[in-house]
Amino acid sequence: MSLVLLPAVDVANGEAVRLVQGEAGSETSYGSPRDAALAWQEAGAEWVHLVDLDAAFGRGSNRELLAKVVGELDVKVELSGGIRDDDSLEAALATGCARVNLGTAALEDPQWCARAIAKHGERIAVGLDVRIIDGDYRLRGRGWVSDGGDLWEVLERLERDGCSRYVVTDVTKDGTLTGPNLELLSEVCAATEAPVIASGGVSAIEDLVAIAGLVPEGVEGAIVGKALYAGRFTLPEALAAVR
Protein backbone atom coordinates (compact mmCIF):
# COMPACT_ATOMS: atom_id res chain seq x y z
CA MET A 1 0.00 0.00 0.00
CA SER A 2 1.67 3.22 -1.12
CA LEU A 3 1.14 6.71 0.29
CA VAL A 4 -1.50 8.78 -1.54
CA LEU A 5 -0.35 12.33 -2.33
CA LEU A 6 -2.86 15.19 -2.41
CA PRO A 7 -1.40 18.38 -3.92
CA ALA A 8 -3.18 21.36 -2.34
CA VAL A 9 -4.86 24.24 -4.12
CA ASP A 10 -5.85 26.91 -1.58
CA VAL A 11 -8.16 29.56 -3.01
CA ALA A 12 -8.62 33.15 -1.79
CA ASN A 13 -10.22 35.99 -3.75
CA GLY A 14 -10.49 33.70 -6.77
CA GLU A 15 -6.75 32.98 -6.86
CA ALA A 16 -4.62 29.99 -5.88
CA VAL A 17 -2.55 31.05 -2.85
CA ARG A 18 -0.39 29.62 -0.07
CA LEU A 19 -0.39 30.78 3.55
CA VAL A 20 2.20 30.51 6.32
CA GLN A 21 0.73 28.78 9.42
CA GLY A 22 -2.76 29.60 8.13
CA GLU A 23 -2.33 33.32 8.87
CA ALA A 24 -4.66 35.61 6.93
CA GLY A 25 -2.46 38.16 5.18
CA SER A 26 0.45 35.76 4.61
CA GLU A 27 -0.82 34.73 1.16
CA THR A 28 1.46 34.24 -1.82
CA SER A 29 -0.49 34.08 -5.09
CA TYR A 30 0.09 31.32 -7.65
CA GLY A 31 -2.46 32.35 -10.31
CA SER A 32 -5.61 30.54 -11.40
CA PRO A 33 -6.98 27.68 -9.23
CA ARG A 34 -8.14 25.93 -12.40
CA ASP A 35 -4.66 26.03 -13.93
CA ALA A 36 -3.03 24.89 -10.67
CA ALA A 37 -5.43 21.95 -10.25
CA LEU A 38 -5.14 20.87 -13.89
CA ALA A 39 -1.34 21.09 -13.67
CA TRP A 40 -1.37 18.67 -10.72
CA GLN A 41 -3.66 16.33 -12.62
CA GLU A 42 -1.34 16.40 -15.64
CA ALA A 43 1.66 15.74 -13.37
CA GLY A 44 0.11 12.48 -12.20
CA ALA A 45 -1.96 13.38 -9.12
CA GLU A 46 -4.82 11.01 -8.30
CA TRP A 47 -6.26 13.47 -5.78
CA VAL A 48 -6.36 17.25 -5.36
CA HIS A 49 -6.99 18.89 -1.97
CA LEU A 50 -9.04 22.01 -2.81
CA VAL A 51 -9.58 24.62 -0.08
CA ASP A 52 -11.85 27.67 0.03
CA LEU A 53 -9.83 29.88 2.37
CA ASP A 54 -12.32 32.76 2.28
CA ALA A 55 -15.09 30.41 3.47
CA ALA A 56 -12.76 28.94 6.12
CA PHE A 57 -11.99 32.41 7.49
CA GLY A 58 -15.68 33.44 7.26
CA ARG A 59 -15.01 36.28 4.80
CA GLY A 60 -17.00 35.21 1.73
CA SER A 61 -16.66 32.20 -0.54
CA ASN A 62 -15.37 30.91 -3.87
CA ARG A 63 -18.14 28.32 -4.14
CA GLU A 64 -19.02 28.73 -7.84
CA LEU A 65 -15.38 28.82 -8.89
CA LEU A 66 -14.52 25.67 -6.92
CA ALA A 67 -17.54 23.84 -8.36
CA LYS A 68 -16.26 24.67 -11.85
CA VAL A 69 -12.76 23.45 -11.00
CA VAL A 70 -14.09 20.14 -9.62
CA GLY A 71 -16.20 19.74 -12.76
CA GLU A 72 -13.17 20.13 -15.03
CA LEU A 73 -10.95 17.65 -13.19
CA ASP A 74 -10.86 13.93 -13.93
CA VAL A 75 -9.14 13.14 -10.63
CA LYS A 76 -10.70 12.85 -7.18
CA VAL A 77 -11.12 16.01 -5.14
CA GLU A 78 -11.16 16.53 -1.38
CA LEU A 79 -13.01 19.81 -0.80
CA SER A 80 -12.42 21.83 2.34
CA GLY A 81 -13.14 25.22 3.88
CA GLY A 82 -16.21 26.71 5.55
CA ILE A 83 -18.40 23.60 5.32
CA ARG A 84 -20.40 24.08 8.50
CA ASP A 85 -24.13 23.74 7.77
CA ASP A 86 -26.53 21.80 5.54
CA ASP A 87 -26.42 24.43 2.80
CA SER A 88 -22.61 24.53 2.47
CA LEU A 89 -22.34 20.74 2.85
CA GLU A 90 -24.93 19.97 0.16
CA ALA A 91 -23.33 22.54 -2.19
CA ALA A 92 -19.91 20.97 -1.64
CA LEU A 93 -21.14 17.40 -2.21
CA ALA A 94 -23.12 18.52 -5.28
CA THR A 95 -19.88 19.54 -7.03
CA GLY A 96 -19.16 15.84 -7.46
CA CYS A 97 -16.08 15.92 -5.24
CA ALA A 98 -15.08 12.55 -3.80
CA ARG A 99 -15.23 13.82 -0.23
CA VAL A 100 -15.44 16.92 1.91
CA ASN A 101 -13.35 17.87 4.89
CA LEU A 102 -15.23 19.31 7.88
CA GLY A 103 -13.25 21.53 10.22
CA THR A 104 -14.67 24.10 12.60
CA ALA A 105 -18.20 22.74 12.34
CA ALA A 106 -17.13 19.38 13.74
CA LEU A 107 -15.87 21.18 16.84
CA GLU A 108 -18.65 23.73 17.28
CA ASP A 109 -21.70 21.66 16.31
CA PRO A 110 -21.15 18.02 17.32
CA GLN A 111 -24.76 16.97 16.63
CA TRP A 112 -24.73 18.34 13.10
CA CYS A 113 -21.37 16.73 12.44
CA ALA A 114 -22.62 13.36 13.70
CA ARG A 115 -25.64 13.58 11.37
CA ALA A 116 -23.41 14.46 8.39
CA ILE A 117 -21.15 11.47 9.13
CA ALA A 118 -24.15 9.15 9.54
CA LYS A 119 -25.73 10.33 6.27
CA HIS A 120 -22.68 10.59 4.00
CA GLY A 121 -20.18 8.11 5.49
CA GLU A 122 -17.03 7.82 3.38
CA ARG A 123 -17.62 11.22 1.75
CA ILE A 124 -16.97 12.99 5.06
CA ALA A 125 -13.51 13.49 6.55
CA VAL A 126 -12.88 15.59 9.64
CA GLY A 127 -9.93 17.95 9.84
CA LEU A 128 -8.07 17.91 13.14
CA ASP A 129 -5.99 21.09 13.28
CA VAL A 130 -3.68 20.70 16.25
CA ARG A 131 -1.59 23.24 18.15
CA ILE A 132 0.61 21.88 20.92
CA ILE A 133 0.38 24.17 23.96
CA ASP A 134 2.44 23.31 27.07
CA GLY A 135 2.48 19.67 26.01
CA ASP A 136 -1.30 19.52 25.49
CA TYR A 137 -2.75 18.80 22.06
CA ARG A 138 -5.38 21.49 21.49
CA LEU A 139 -7.61 21.75 18.43
CA ARG A 140 -8.00 25.01 16.52
CA GLY A 141 -11.18 26.17 14.80
CA ARG A 142 -12.29 29.03 12.52
CA GLY A 143 -9.19 29.39 10.40
CA TRP A 144 -7.07 28.33 13.39
CA VAL A 145 -7.81 31.37 15.59
CA SER A 146 -10.11 29.82 18.23
CA ASP A 147 -9.57 26.96 20.70
CA GLY A 148 -11.53 23.85 19.77
CA GLY A 149 -10.86 21.71 22.82
CA ASP A 150 -8.68 18.73 23.66
CA LEU A 151 -7.67 16.58 20.67
CA TRP A 152 -8.22 13.24 22.42
CA GLU A 153 -11.67 14.14 23.81
CA VAL A 154 -12.88 15.31 20.40
CA LEU A 155 -11.35 12.29 18.66
CA GLU A 156 -13.14 9.95 21.08
CA ARG A 157 -16.45 11.63 20.22
CA LEU A 158 -15.81 11.42 16.47
CA GLU A 159 -14.88 7.75 16.84
CA ARG A 160 -18.26 7.11 18.49
CA ASP A 161 -19.92 8.97 15.61
CA GLY A 162 -18.19 6.64 13.13
CA CYS A 163 -15.98 9.18 11.34
CA SER A 164 -14.39 7.45 8.33
CA ARG A 165 -11.20 9.52 7.94
CA TYR A 166 -9.16 12.27 9.63
CA VAL A 167 -6.99 14.99 8.11
CA VAL A 168 -4.39 15.82 10.75
CA THR A 169 -2.48 19.12 10.67
CA ASP A 170 0.09 20.43 13.12
CA VAL A 171 -0.77 24.12 12.77
CA THR A 172 2.70 25.19 13.86
CA LYS A 173 4.15 23.33 10.87
CA ASP A 174 1.78 24.31 8.05
CA GLY A 175 3.34 26.34 5.25
CA THR A 176 6.68 26.51 7.09
CA LEU A 177 8.66 23.80 5.24
CA THR A 178 10.02 22.60 8.62
CA GLY A 179 9.09 18.92 8.37
CA PRO A 180 5.96 17.03 9.48
CA ASN A 181 5.07 16.07 13.06
CA LEU A 182 5.48 12.29 12.79
CA GLU A 183 4.86 11.76 16.50
CA LEU A 184 1.44 13.44 16.32
CA LEU A 185 0.48 11.35 13.29
CA SER A 186 1.58 8.16 15.01
CA GLU A 187 -0.37 8.98 18.17
CA VAL A 188 -3.57 9.74 16.23
CA CYS A 189 -3.18 6.48 14.27
CA ALA A 190 -2.89 4.59 17.57
CA ALA A 191 -6.20 6.09 18.74
CA THR A 192 -8.31 5.23 15.67
CA GLU A 193 -8.88 2.48 13.12
CA ALA A 194 -9.84 5.12 10.52
CA PRO A 195 -7.27 6.18 7.91
CA VAL A 196 -5.33 9.38 8.56
CA ILE A 197 -4.24 12.01 6.03
CA ALA A 198 -1.13 13.98 7.05
CA SER A 199 -0.96 17.71 6.43
CA GLY A 200 1.56 20.43 7.14
CA GLY A 201 5.31 20.84 7.17
CA VAL A 202 6.39 18.68 4.22
CA SER A 203 9.57 20.29 2.89
CA ALA A 204 11.48 17.53 1.11
CA ILE A 205 11.08 14.11 -0.48
CA GLU A 206 12.57 12.64 2.73
CA ASP A 207 9.57 13.96 4.69
CA LEU A 208 7.20 12.08 2.39
CA VAL A 209 9.26 8.91 2.70
CA ALA A 210 9.08 9.29 6.51
CA ILE A 211 5.28 9.73 6.36
CA ALA A 212 5.07 6.71 4.02
CA GLY A 213 6.79 4.77 6.79
CA LEU A 214 3.64 5.32 8.88
CA VAL A 215 1.36 3.65 6.30
CA PRO A 216 1.38 0.37 8.30
CA GLU A 217 0.17 2.37 11.34
CA GLY A 218 -2.77 3.85 9.44
CA VAL A 219 -1.55 6.90 7.52
CA GLU A 220 -3.17 6.80 4.09
CA GLY A 221 -2.07 10.03 2.43
CA ALA A 222 -0.25 13.34 2.67
CA ILE A 223 -1.37 16.79 1.58
CA VAL A 224 1.50 18.69 -0.05
CA GLY A 225 1.37 22.40 -0.75
CA LYS A 226 4.13 24.89 -0.34
CA ALA A 227 7.00 22.47 -1.05
CA LEU A 228 5.57 21.81 -4.52
CA TYR A 229 4.89 25.48 -5.26
CA ALA A 230 8.32 26.49 -3.96
CA GLY A 231 9.97 23.93 -6.24
CA ARG A 232 11.53 21.81 -3.48
CA PHE A 233 10.60 18.77 -5.58
CA THR A 234 8.22 17.93 -8.42
CA LEU A 235 5.04 15.90 -8.07
CA PRO A 236 6.36 13.08 -10.31
CA GLU A 237 9.50 12.88 -8.11
CA ALA A 238 7.33 12.72 -4.99
CA LEU A 239 5.01 10.08 -6.44
CA ALA A 240 7.97 7.93 -7.47
CA ALA A 241 9.46 8.14 -3.96
CA VAL A 242 6.36 6.86 -2.15
CA ARG A 243 5.12 4.24 -4.62
UniProtKB/Swiss-Prot annotation:
Pfam families on file: His_biosynth
Compartments, as annotated in UniProt: Cytoplasm
Species the sequence originates in: Nocardia farcinica (strain IFM 10152)
UniProt keyword annotation of Amino-acid biosynthesis present: yes
Chief place of localization: cytoplasm
Cellular component, GO annotation: cytoplasm
Top EC class of this enzyme: isomerase
Domain of life: Bacteria
Keyword Cytoplasm appears in the UniProt entry: yes
Lineage, uppermost ranks: Bacteria, Bacillati, Actinomycetota, Actinomycetes, Mycobacteriales
Protein name: 1-(5-phosphoribosyl)-5-[(5-phosphoribosylamino)methylideneamino] imidazole-4-carboxamide isomerase
Catalytic residue list: D10 (proton acceptor), D129 (proton donor)
Pathway(s) served: Amino-acid biosynthesis; L-histidine biosynthesis; L-histidine from 5-phospho-alpha-D-ribose 1-diphosphate: step 4/9
GO-annotated molecular function: 1-(5-phosphoribosyl)-5-[(5-phosphoribosylamino)methylideneamino]imidazole-4-carboxamide isomerase activity; phosphoribosylanthranilate isomerase activity
NCBIfam families the record matches: hisA-trpF (TIGR01919)
Catalytic reaction list: 1-(5-phospho-beta-D-ribosyl)-5-[(5-phospho-beta-D-ribosylamino)methylideneamino]imidazole-4-carboxamide = 5-[(5-phospho-1-deoxy-D-ribulos-1-ylimino)methylamino]-1-(5-phospho-beta-D-ribosyl)imidazole-4-carboxamide
Keywords in alphabetical order: Amino-acid biosynthesis, Cytoplasm, Histidine biosynthesis, Isomerase
